[in-house]
Amino acid sequence: AALREGDLGDGPIRTKDAKEVGNKFGELGMDKVLMRKIYAINATTVLVNDTTGIQNLHETRELIIEAFNDVCKKGPIADEPLTGVLVRLVDAKLHEDAIHRGPAQTIPAVRNAIKGALLRANSVLFEPIQKIRIDAPSEWAGGITRQLITRRGVIEDMPVENDVTCVIGKMPVAESF
């Protein structure tokens, strides 16, 4: 909820702010030590650098964050945005020559690694659900509820006013056509 509301920020996290942001995550029940290594937040998705002793990784920080943001905008399934994911960078092998650590090499490698990890973790595509309200004569209420249930809908309330029944519920968008 704190991520959704933007209480923890959004975008790259400066190194000097990482400890404070990590402490905020700790207050929310997450591993404070891990979250102090935070690189970036993109909506409800977080990138953490959990590596140790990798030389020159700091030189590619911005490129890693850029690749992370690309994946957050277009995830591995149907190019849909990611939501509620913690991405941990646990290892990296960087070329010793700086010329081979540029955007053309780093961004696709990181992007593909994150997408591959997400696919291996059995990512799911959330189904869009719509709220519905149907006002109809009371004698039609049975048919309306039957249709709603056969279309995988959920009835939340059915207030009756005079001879009109109002059916309020939710149902998958794909089932409404």
Question: What is the role of each PLM region?
Answer:
Residues 1-177:
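Accessory interaction regions appended to the cores of large information-processing enzymes
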